[in-house]
Curated annotation (Swiss-Prot):
Pathway assigned to this chain's UniProt record: Secondary metabolite biosynthesis; flavonoid biosynthesis
Source species: Petunia hybrida (Petunia)
Gene Ontology MF term list: naringenin-chalcone synthase activity
Protein name: Chalcone synthase J
Record key words, sorted: Acyltransferase, Flavonoid biosynthesis, Transferase
Listed InterPro entries: Chalcone/stilbene_synt_C, Chalcone/stilbene_synt_N, Chalcone/stilbene_synthase_AS, Polyketide_synthase_type-III, Thiolase-like
Family note: Belongs to the thiolase-like superfamily. Chalcone/stilbene synthases family.
EC number of this enzyme: 2.3.1.74
Reaction(s) the record says it catalyses: (E)-4-coumaroyl-CoA + 3 malonyl-CoA + 3 H(+) = 2',4,4',6'-tetrahydroxychalcone + 3 CO2 + 4 CoA
Length: 389
């Protein structure tokens, strides 16, 4: 007679969860940050608000973003004037866009990841889909399963309304799935479209304007599994540990509320200050078991909520400027894509490391950290181990 413990042992994988492929996708419509204020105030019929426009121009200039990608074109916005008007009822129009486009963009990224992985999609056992862009039932996970032609028995997990920390959350969940289910291959997809948050400017809601200056569209997909098949599957990064914490005294610092007007965005406290003040504690808890306390000796992937967060973290920890190079590059080229950002940064880092012949996928270093920051304030901390290139 077999025991429960024997069954459990047989179900568990041997090695750590490993990222084996990464794919990314953006809409084709690219917006230039330097000319965006002119376009934004024109399309929202707000050109008479000259002082506010100057303020927005300064926000865009300081954003360290060169360009962003957006599904919302001028044509779509002209067809849906309520999306442009500040606080006009527009949820139906927004939902009609995102319930179709979020899975579609996710499919593009997933196909690239599956192609790099090189295995038949029938070997995907689990799907984790994450978006802060709209909600629906059955969800974007179901739509993507259909779009990709995954097995009907694929085990799905749908994460809605998590926000900017969720790139860390999906890795934490995928790690547990891969390590506790022998042979599991988890497809993780984060897909974000700003059609839920786009709206015209208003003098009394400047935090909404911050969002208009920062957010961009993008989707990223990764394949995670334990015990990669030698010569068949290529490991990129190993997931060593993953934790989540709520920062003290940070309630209401970042809020989002789904209303008739779409998803409203609120910044109520000094977010960069709260994060930089507490980040050391998260690092110590994560790296003490490894005997690491020099934050310049590890590679860095931090959710680029905005340039101020990166600047203050850099200052607080005494990081060398090159530590956040991959993070700042993604912010500059794509803007803040919420949950998808950190996966874009992973992709950028492994590609740059290989191109520059740096020896490992983590800029030549062995150990690294991935941070997600978002509503709560919630911080996700993932310890990564790089792989020789």
């Amino acid at each position: 007679m077999v025991t429960v413990e024997e069954i459990r042992r047989a179900q568990r994988a041997e090695g750590p969860a490993t990222i084996m492929a990464i794919g990314t996708a953006t809409p084709s419509n690219c917006v230039d940050q330097s000319t965006y204020p002119d376009y934004y105030f024109r399309i929202t019929n707000s050109e008479h608000k000259t002082e506010l426009k100057e303020k927005f121009q300064r926000m865009c200039d300081k954003s360290m973003i060169k360009k962003r990608y957006m599904h919302l074109t001028e044509e779509i916005l002209k067809e849906n004037p309520n999306i442009c008007e500040y606080m006009a009822p527009s949820l139906d129009a927004r939902q009609d866009i995102v319930v179709v486009e979020v899975p579609k963009l996710g499919k593009e990224a997933a196909q690239k990841a599956i192609k790099e992985w090189g295995q038949p999609k029938s070997k995907i056992t689990h799907l984790v889909f994450c978006t802060t862009s709209g909600v629906d039932m059955p969800g974007a996970d179901y739509q993507l399963t259909k779009l990709l032609g995954l097995r009907s028995s694929v085990k799905r997990l749908m994460m809605y309304q998590q926000g900017c920390f969720a790139g860390g959350t999906v890795l934490r969940l995928a790690k547990d799935l891969a390590e506790n289910n022998k042979g599991a291959r988890v497809l993780v997809v984060c897909s974000e479209i700003t059609a839920v948050t786009f709206r015209g400017p208003n003098d009394t809601h400047l935090d909404s304007l911050v969002g208009q200056a920062l957010f961009g569209d993008g989707a990223a997909a990764i394949i995670i599994g334990s015990d990669p098949l030698p010569g068949v599957e290529r490991p990129l990064f190993e997931l060593v540990s993953a934790s989540q914490t709520l920062l003290p005294d940070s309630e209401g610092a970042i809020d989002g509320h789904l209303r008739e007007v779409g998803l409203t965005f609120h910044l109520l406290k000094d977010v960069p200050g709260l994060i930089s003040k507490n980040i050391q504690k998260s690092l110590v808890e994560a790296f003490q078991p490894l005997g690491i306390s020099d934050w310049n000796s590890i590679f860095w992937i931090a959710h680029p909520g905005g340039p101020a967060i990166l600047d203050q973290v850099e200052l607080k920890l005494g990081l060398k400027p090159e530590k956040l190079r991959a993070t700042r590059h993604v912010l500059s080229e794509y803007g803040n894509m919420s949950s998808a950002c950190v996966l874009f940064i992973l992709d950028e880092m492994r590609k740059a490391s290989s191109k520059e012949g740096l020896g490992t996928t983590g800029e030549g270093l062995e150990w690294g950290v991935l941070f997600g920051f978002g509503p709560g304030l919630t911080v996700e901390t993932v310890v990564l181990h790089s792989v020789s290139t």
